[in-house]
Amino acid sequence: MQNIGFIGLGNMGAPMAENLLKAGHQVKVFDLNQAVCEKLAQQGASVCANLEELAQGVSCIITMLPAGEHVRSVYLGTHQGDKGLLDLVAENSLLIDSSTIDPQSARLVGEEAAKRGLDFVDAPVSGGVAGAHAATLTFIVGGSDNAFARAETILKDMGKNIFHAGQAGDGQMGKICNNLMLGILMSGTCEALNLGIDNGLDPTVLSNIMLQSSGRNWALELYNPCPGVMENAPASRGYQPGFMSKLMLKDLGLGLDAAAKSQSSVPMGALARNLYAFHNAAGNEELDFSSLFEFYAKNNNESVG
């Protein structure tokens, strides 16, 4: 068992930290939300007031942060002179960033960590809040072979599938590709279901037809976006997230940014991003990303192409 620091206790980070505690690790936590910190303290975590306190006496730190700028400031420090983790942790520490951010930020942190003799991996996750609670997440890891081997022993306490995608930044690229496809698949699934309903088909029957046909996909099988078709899906719970629409828009934006840098053609990804941008602008950003189904239902007589 290890002494681990955990920074970022949101919908994903909090249950991930809980699973580390359940696995027997000593866990120190830091987050601006004191309520969630206190909840974890009741389960045995030590609450820290700042990064300096958290970095003392730990061999590994895990971060789960909103965006690239937060990751850069936490690891590299701020323009105001605040030190980052790279200047606070002990020699030979392991640093794991499970945020979903741009690959360039992950590579920058990885390069700076290597200069200091530190092991860093970017390890974004797939599996959502349910996977975080159940410790069944998929981790997509970028980093050296040695850093991956060290990280894998800890990631297994929070997830079921751990993939080594390549060097620092490659974990982010793998996650971006996955979520680009997820956004496209969800958009297409919403579109096909809406078309069938408009033409008199029962959505449950249509879903079952497609599940046994070539249109079968993850959204149909585990996350049906039509209310009432799948009992435990967000669609049948008023689109309570889950994975919020604003986060899907963010990830699709990361995909388009990456495509621009590599001059890759992503017309379907661009369309999916535009659909989510319209959907979010209508006040749906806090709803689950499968709520895009409602966008189609409300725009039947309008062109959305």
Regions found by a protein language model. Name each.
Residues 1-64, 88, 92-93, 129, ...:
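NAD(P)+-binding Rossmann beta1-loop-alpha1 motif at the extreme N-terminus of oxidoreductases
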Residues 4, 74, 100-180:
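Rossmann-fold dinucleotide-binding core
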Residues 16-17, 109, 154, 195:
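Hydrophobic residues within alpha-helices
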Residues 27, 47, 119-121, 162, ...:
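Hydrophobic beta-strand scaffold residues
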Residues 51-119:
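Rossmann-fold NAD(P) dinucleotide-binding segment
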Residues 170-271, 275-300:
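Helical "substrate-binding/catalytic lid" subdomain
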